[in-house]
């Protein structure tokens, strides 16, 4: 009897002991659960070449691990929807396909998050086909989008146009270059339609100094990057007659890539206590106090990271923490050395970009800050999930899991009024 009790206890403890050290479990009411899984599922659907999109069914596991970069890990279940991958709809616009014919699957994904944007690092989905009839060659859609080689010469003018369109229609300070083509499809019409998914990366060429992308513009390992989906129509005269593009842009990630040696024009790290930063920091805090409507001045407390980049001048990129001082804007016209930080004053995490051309006495500072203690609050019941207890059996061991079931859509088999149920604050994992 004691042996049985010990075995039962171990079966409950093993899942939690196996959990990655330092990982924090997430609950269904945490808005990052939906944001992260939505990003992962949209990426999976975007990479499908044919068939229907998949719709989120439930999230069964979710953890967050803080470090130099915050990493999120999820396991979620999906079901085939009734919207094709070429429909232009998102998975949230689709309903579940009839249960008998629908494919199902489970995905395991890891995401990074920086400046409130998620990016998928890894993702594996195992799909179980439905019981519906299999498509034959005769069933293939004539005139529908078909996959084409990603290195096709037909794509070169289309991709060149896509990158030029991005550079000409965004407010980013630098030009971007093509990094990689991820998928490409074509459709025969009166001419040709192309749908291409591709990634772009920031170069060292600023728009102020370079009117267009050149061959000597170098992609920056520290630079911003993005993923785009472009739709292009090439008419019968082989002219681009229509184009649309949507891009998700992510801030640069310098955690895993080192700068190449002898990279002219690339940013270089400089010590946070370097005298070289003194002038740039002065412009940064002056800009912060000018644009911030707080009644007290802020001063720089800690410099966390800094880089400089030689262009037509110098660009300093600095991350620092600013703290509220005891000097009010009513009593002083500017921040002075005798202003002291308040012990319980507000703290800001700031990112500054300071462009300096000393021979012209030109300084262009840009500062973005966020309160360190800023918390996003939501009304109760806003979560798109409801808590569901799910029984799982693996290798002879049965356990109950708290899963977050998506309540945005109902399959036809479960059609009817949605229950008036508020998501409970419970963790996703056991």
Swiss-Prot record:
Expression by tissue: Plasma.
Region described as Disordered: 411-430
GO BP term, example: negative regulation of blood coagulation
One of the Pfam families matching this protein, by short name: Cystatin
Residue ranges occupied by any Cystatin kininogen-type domain in the UniProt entry: 28-131, 150-253, 272-375
GO cellular component, as recorded: extracellular region
GO molecular function: cysteine-type endopeptidase inhibitor activity
Compartments where located: Secreted, Extracellular space
Disulfide-bond pairs as recorded: 28-404, 83-94, 107-125, 141-144, 205-217, 228-247, 263-266, 327-339, 350-369
Induction (record text): In response to an inflammatory stimulant. T-kininogen II synthesis is induced and the plasma concentration of T-kininogen I is raised.
Signal peptide limits: 1-18
Database matches in SMART domains: CY (SM00043)
Residues of this chain annotated as glycosylated in UniProt: 82, 168, 204, 326
Record flagged with keyword Transport: no
Protein keywords: Acute phase, Disulfide bond, Glycoprotein, Protease inhibitor, Pyrrolidone carboxylic acid, Repeat, Secreted, Signal, Thiol protease inhibitor, Vasoactive, Vasodilator
Residue numbers carrying Pyrrolidone carboxylic acid: 19
Record has Disulfide bond as a keyword: yes
PTM: As T-kinin is preceded by a Met instead of an Arg or Lys, it is not released from its precursor by either tissue or plasma kallikrein.
Note: Rats express four types of kininogens: the classical HMW and LMW kininogens produced by alternative splicing of the same gene, and two additional LMW-like kininogens: T-I and T-II.
Function, as annotated: Kininogens are plasma glycoproteins with a number of functions: (1) as precursor of the active peptide bradykinin they effect smooth muscle contraction, induction of hypotension and increase of vascular permeability. (2) They play a role in blood coagulation by helping to position optimally prekallikrein and factor XI next to factor XII. (3) They are inhibitor of thiol proteases.
Name of this chain's protein: T-kininogen 1
The gene coding this protein: Map1
